Amino acid sequence: MVPTGQVAEKQACEEPRQDRELKSWRCLVFYLCFFGFMAQLRPGESFITPYLLQQNFTIEQVTNEIIPVLPYSHLAVLVPIFLLTDYLRYKPILILQCLSFMCVWLLLLLGTSVVHMQLMEVFYSVTMAARIAYSSYIFSLVRPSRYQRMASYSRAAVLLGVFTSSVLGQVLWPLEQKSQNSNMLNYISLGFIIFSLGLSLFLKRPKHSLFFNRSALVHKALPCELDQMHPGPGRPEPGKLERVLGSCRNSFLVCMLSELVGNLRQPQLRLWCLWWVFNSAGYYLIVYYVHVLWSIDKNLNYNGAVDAASTLLSAITSFSAGFVKIRWALWSKLVIASVIAIQAGLVFCMYMVHYVTWVHKIWVLYMTYVLFRGAYQFLVPIATFQIASSLSKELCALVFGINTFLATALKTAITLVVSDKRGLGLKVEKQFCIYSVYFMVLSVICFVGAVLDGVRYCRRGRHQPLPLPQELSPLENSVQVPSMQDGGLGGLQPSAPQLLPEDGVEDSEASLRAEAKA
């Protein structure tokens, strides 16, 4: 037994250390949240398209030559940024993001040709790919027990930053028009970006990351090493090539991929991954081109207010999704089909409004976009939960990275065919007609799948118990879901993902945790 005096002395030594750790953690949380808030303050972002049209770029140039560069370059930089984020341990990528934003606004201020604006889109694609660094970085500095709180704080900071930026832009836009200074919003945005760059230089760089700089590797002899130490009778000593192949087969990434292939047999995982890929591609095409669609009324511009309203509604719908409690094994496809059908109807309204004269077109476009974005954000935390509920933290990062890449590839292919002048080069109104058909086809496919699931359940599934209804609660899920079997990952426990999809305001594991916390 330990003497009482030694126990008291040990506790007395631990208390100051715990106090210092708590104080350090609070300071770190505040600084990260402040950086996340300031990094979103770009009041000119909602008005980039009107600014380009004021600089004598035509709608055709913006639609068919400038904007299509964004998905192309995003696809090109996505994988390198994804890997470098982990290899360089996050902080350098956050600095790169700020530098890329500086290049974006410098090109907006100084550029005069289509080539300059296309280069601006290339730098903007780097900032989009680099958003993954912030969402991963915040979880590498704290203990797992603090993940949920960190996620809620950081997510709230980002949402508040986007909302504030949109409102500020809307307030300053009329002043810019009256002052005849078309660059005022761009200069203010550049100032905020430079300040964010200064903040990023003082961020603490973590010692470990998810894949390349792991903190707790399983140190065990590989099969080829065991064969070399104790070769069997009559077996030749393995050569260099065989040892290299053995190391590759037993590498962490290969083990993760083999584990992922096994997990893809789960119907719910496949379903929500497919939703992520196909719906995200259509969603971001709408986001890219909706500002061009709004340019039909040059005398009325409430882009900032609409972005603020859509951000607020997205936060509300994402939060409300946390209270949905149904049997997802039975109703997932029906829920997805219903939401996508709503999206299809809203996009079709955006298209049809150009052919009617009895409504104020711009207000209908504003309202349908706000509702469209809110509908998409309703399913994001549900999809995040369904994907994360049976995967480890590392596998979640890999799955979301693959989903984002596939969605970007699909988005790029559609852009090449529909928008690019080397393809069909359609006007923006015709593009929205095609996008509405795209969403309608997805909805019909999901409805058919839901009907087939219902028929199977009625015929032979009544005696088979379905999984109980689940709320979107990662804390409960971490207790209910059993740990993964030994498949090369050392029995990693399921956890929510660290890496996010491309939209820094939206698709994230952090939003799931924040909403569950709320």
UniProtKB/Swiss-Prot annotation:
Post-translational modification N-acetylmethionine, affected residues: M1
Binding site for folate: I48, T49, E121, R131, V162, A281, G282, I286, Y366, V370
Glycosylation sites: N56
Extracellular side: 51-62, 111-114, 177-181, 293-300, 351-353, 416-423
Membrane topology listed for this record: Multi-pass membrane protein
Segments for region (Disordered): 480-518
Annotated Pfam families: Folate_carrier
GO molecular function: 2',3'-cyclic GMP-AMP binding; antiporter activity; cyclic-GMP-AMP transmembrane transporter activity; folate:monoatomic anion antiporter activity; folic acid binding; methotrexate transmembrane transporter activity
Protein keywords: Acetylation, Antiport, Cell membrane, Folate-binding, Glycoprotein, Membrane, Phosphoprotein, Transmembrane, Transmembrane helix, Transport
Gene Ontology cellular component terms for the protein in this record: apical plasma membrane; basolateral plasma membrane
Residue ranges crossing the lipid bilayer per the database entry: 30-50, 63-85, 90-110, 115-137, 152-176, 182-200, 267-292, 301-323, 330-350, 354-377, 392-415, 424-448
Family membership noted in the UniProt record: Belongs to the reduced folate carrier (RFC) transporter (TC 2.A.48) family.
Function: Antiporter that mediates the import of reduced folates, driven by the export of organic anions. Also acts as an importer of immunoreactive cyclic dinucleotides, but with a lower transporter activity. Mechanistically, acts as a secondary active transporter, which exports intracellular organic anions down their concentration gradients to facilitate the uptake of its substrates. Has high affinity for N5-methyltetrahydrofolate, the predominant circulating form of folate. Also mediates the import of antifolate drug methotrexate.
Name of the protein: Reduced folate transporter
The organism of origin for this protein: Cricetulus griseus (Chinese hamster)
Higher taxonomy: Eukaryota, Metazoa, Chordata, Craniata, Vertebrata
Encoding gene per record: SLC19A1
